[in-house]
């Protein structure tokens, strides 16, 4: 994974190997974007990124749309730099899909951003969140699930 904010000890504890963005570009069969929206990641996935790919991976964008230059992604799909894409977000949060160049392509799947939501998933998400808070307040740090940024004991 490439995450400049994930402390290496936390990555190791959850069996994640941190690598550079260049390593991702050269080695990945699938690239899954989960970036938060910040000025630093605006158009992170651009022509330079896609042109640096070595393996024609599948590209998944489940983050905010601003991190992907959609014109560059379209060029990467057309040139074969990206073999396929799964998209549930666009730069425009309410896109007009009647004129969207990704619609109708054999190598693109578009889903609504809320694709996983169900009554069961909301309940599970709430239970995990409350459980994490309780474990944290009791200083049971090893019991906290889905740590993104490490917890200092």
Over which residues does each language-model region extend?
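The conserved SAM/SAH-binding core of class I Rossmann-like methyltransferase domains
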Residues: 2
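Rossmann-like adenosine-cofactor binding region
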Residues: 5-100
């Amino acid at each position: 994974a490439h995450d400049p904010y994930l402390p290496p000890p936390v990555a190791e504890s959850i069996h994640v190997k941190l690598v550079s963005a260049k390593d991702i570009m050269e080695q990945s069969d699938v690239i899954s974007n989960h970036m938060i929206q910040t000025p630093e990641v605006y158009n992170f996935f651009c022509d330079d990124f896609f042109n640096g790919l070595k393996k024609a991976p599948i590209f998944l964008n489940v983050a905010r749309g601003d991190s992907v230059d959609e014109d560059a992604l379209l060029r990467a799909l057309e040139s074969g730099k990206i073999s396929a894409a799964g998209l549930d977000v666009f730069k425009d949060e309410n896109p007009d899909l009647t004129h969207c160049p990704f619609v109708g392509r054999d190598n693109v799947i578009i889903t609504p951003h809320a694709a996983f939501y169900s009554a069961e998933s909301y309940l599970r998400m709430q239970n995990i969140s409350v459980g994490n808070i309780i474990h944290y307040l009791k200083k049971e740090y090893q019991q906290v699930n889905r740590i993104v940024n490490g917890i200092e004991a």
